[in-house]
Amino acid sequence: MPVLMPSADVPTIDISPLFGTDPDAKAHVARQINEACRGSGFFYASHHGIDVRRLQDVVNEFHRTMTDQEKHDLAIHAYNENNSHVRNGYYMARPGRKTVESWCYLNPSFGEDHPMIKAGTPMHEVNVWPDEERHPDFRSFGEQYYREVFRLSKVLLLRGFALALGKPEEFFENEVTEEDTLSCRSLMIRYPYLDPYPEAAIKTGPDGTRLSFEDHLDVSMITVLFQTEVQNLQVETVDGWQSLPTSGENFLINCGTYLGYLTNDYFPAPNHRVKYVNAERLSLPFFLHAGQNSVMKPFHPEDTGDRKLNPAVTYGEYLQEGFHALIAKNVQT
């Protein structure tokens, strides 16, 4: 069962000290992260150094210029049986039934010579990109942005979350590397404005709220989200479902299920959902993951030796099972 969060307060935290060397300033950020993760489970990261205006411009141009044929040719196996990819590719809208569409790409380090690719390891794929002539510089931007947001996420996780959990800054260092991370960037989740909007594409929550995507927990270590400034997210709290504020400048951060598992729910993954809003908007999440063979020993910061802790598991196995469970619950996105 998901943990019901105590509040829906979402603080904005200046994370710039995490890039520096002042231990007191870092400790101050860590205390704020701790409070946020044990409050609503969400916080906004400001002073992150990423050009979100250009990000939106590139994403909007991509959607404007993609043809239906291109989308189908690049679609993952769930939408195009001729494509073996299950992660990297296009996730198509289905007229009258599903309006959201997205493009997902994975670690640019996964080339044909990568050991996991050679071994045919599940969840590892070499990215296929849209045609360069039709979408000039799209791939170069995507790969550059992936590395920027990965490094931002790693700083948040390594220096922020580790300190917030009472661990040394380098606690996660060897488990999350740019060469092997399973992290994915669903760069382009697009929610369209439609008139009329198909009723079959709208879901209804148990409380009667109309939804675009039902309640779920993110299968990740942490999620780093930028979205356009249209209110849509809700978190499940002890007082029921409550709306989260928006920001047109900052990244929304929350713990995924693995950090909840690793900390025995000291930092739980917040249960959240997407309200139905008939408005053109973008949702651009980065899901930070460890590597396939990473194994971390679960702990609890307040454990005195009498607490039953989760067993250690291989990250790749954990992620694959988590994805299958998410799709089974919420259907293919």
Curated annotation (Swiss-Prot):
Keyword annotations from UniProtKB, A to Z: Antibiotic biosynthesis, Iron, Metal-binding, Oxidoreductase, Vitamin C
GO terms, biological process: antibiotic biosynthetic process
GO molecular function per UniProt: iron ion binding; isopenicillin-N synthase activity; L-ascorbic acid binding
Keyword DNA repair: no
Cofactor: Fe cation; L-ascorbate
Binding residues annotated for N-[(5S)-5-amino-5-carboxypentanoyl]-L-cysteinyl-D-valine, in chain numbering: R87, Y91, Y191, H216, D218, S283
Disulfide bonds: none
Pathway: Antibiotic biosynthesis; penicillin G biosynthesis; penicillin G from L-alpha-aminoadipate and L-cysteine and L-valine: step 2/3
Limits of the Fe2OG dioxygenase domain: 180-290
EC number: 1.21.3.1
Binding site for isopenicillin N: R87, Y91, Y191, S283
Binding site for 2-oxoglutarate: R281
InterPro entries hit by this protein: DIOX_N, IPNS-like_FE2OG_OXY, IPNS-like_sf, Iron_ascorbate_oxido_reductase, Isopenicillin-N_synth_CS, Oxoglu/Fe-dep_dioxygenase_dom
Binding, Fe(2+): H216, D218, H272
Catalytic reaction annotation: N-[(5S)-5-amino-5-carboxypentanoyl]-L-cysteinyl-D-valine + O2 = isopenicillin N + 2 H2O
Family: Belongs to the iron/ascorbate-dependent oxidoreductase family.
Function summary: Removes, in the presence of oxygen, 4 hydrogen atoms from delta-L-(alpha-aminoadipyl)-L-cysteinyl-D-valine (ACV) to form the azetidinone and thiazolidine rings of isopenicillin.
Protein name: Isopenicillin N synthase
Organism: Streptomyces microflavus
Gene coding for it: pcbC
